[in-house]
């Protein structure tokens, strides 16, 4: 795994601090980015899991969008962009479309259409984690924005994983599907302003 550390703490950019971070969180490789903003060039093409950790406004989302846009359509496979909230999904969809990327947004479909498989009719989909039970296909690239908040949805507030119409609990199904998708994908990009040991352990335990 690799961590791209941004300028969210000046002292973090010191060599010693980076070394401490790596040892504390069992990270095999780190890359400190001293520029103010991240870019697509900062994302390692050869490593399956990349964690982009930086302050808000450091261009995490923008760098990932450009990274994906550079990959030839026929070789990148299907792309899944997961978020913890509807609002963040809507914002991301607009940014992707502004970048010229054709994307399917789950709020643009009815529950009936999603159950019929229309959510995955395109090869680039964006939705919040609670709708994961509608998916069946594998994905070459998976992006998780605000990964810590996304993991939190699997905690005590399981009500967030209820079916929007039937109110059926989808928590177990969503989590099982979540692990399956991450295990099978070729590239996993995680983004947040901070990363906990729980997230690092989860990624390592996927036996990638």
Where are these regions (language model features)?
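Modules that initiate DNA replication and primer synthesis
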Residues: 1-12
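Pre-Walker A adenine-sensing motif
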Residues: 17-46
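Walker A/P-loop
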Residues: 46-66
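Conserved Walker A/P-loop ATP-binding site and its immediately adjacent core
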Residues: 76-98, 195-199
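Structural recognition of the conserved hydrophobic beta-strand(s) that form the central parallel beta-sheet
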Residues: 81, 125-128, 143, 186-193
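Inter-Walker segment of RecA-like/P-loop motor cores
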Residues: 96-136
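SF2 helicase catalytic motif II
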Residues: 136-190
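Interdomain hinge/linker at the junction between the two RecA-like core domains of SF2 helicases
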Residues: 197-208
């Amino acid at each position: 795994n690799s961590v791209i550390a941004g300028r969210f703490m000046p002292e973090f950019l010191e060599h010693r601090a980076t070394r401490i971070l790596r040892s504390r969180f069992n990270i095999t490789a780190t890359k400190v980015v001293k520029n103010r903003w991240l870019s697509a060039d900062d994302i390692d093409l050869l490593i399956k899991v990349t964690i982009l950790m930086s302050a808000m406004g450091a261009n995490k989302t923008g760098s990932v969008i450009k990274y994906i846009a550079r990959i030839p359509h026929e070789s990148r496979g299907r792309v899944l962009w997961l978020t913890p909230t509807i609002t963040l999904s809507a914002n991301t969809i607009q940014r992707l479309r502004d970048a010229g990327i054709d994307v399917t947004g789950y709020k643009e479909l009815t529950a009936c259409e999603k159950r019929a498989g229309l959510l995955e009719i395109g090869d680039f989909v964006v939705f919040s984690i609670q709708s994961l039970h509608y998916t069946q296909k594998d994905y070459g690239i998976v992006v998780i924005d605000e990964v810590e908040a996304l993991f939190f949805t699997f905690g005590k507030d399981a009500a967030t994983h209820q079916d929007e119409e039937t109110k059926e609990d989808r928590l177990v199904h969503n989590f099982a599907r979540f692990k399956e998708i991450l295990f099978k994908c070729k590239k996993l990009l995680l983004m947040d302003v901070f990363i906990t040991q729980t997230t690092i352990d989860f990624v390592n335990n996927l036996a990638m």
